[in-house]
């Protein structure tokens, strides 16, 4: 069973969070996503890690983890259950 690790992650300001959400939406649409993300999409800090959660009308469309060193986004195949809430 994996051990939960906590990494130091600085919460982004409003402009950085908006840019990260925009980049996640672009990545979602370029990957072939057909549903459009809703305004409920946004930044989530979970157990010390930063995530961008894209919500759709039917639920969570995708979750992207934010690397703390260069703010690169990585799409998660399986995301933590607490990120959805």
Where are these regions (language model features)?
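Exposed beta-strand-loop-beta-strand "reactive/processing" segments of non-cytosolic proteins
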Residues: 32-68, 72
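A short, surface-exposed interaction/processing loop segment used at functional sites
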Residues: 65-85
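Extended aliphatic helical segments
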Residues: 21, 26, 53, 60-63, ...
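Short, non-transmembrane alpha-helical segments in secretory-pathway proteins
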Residues: 2-38
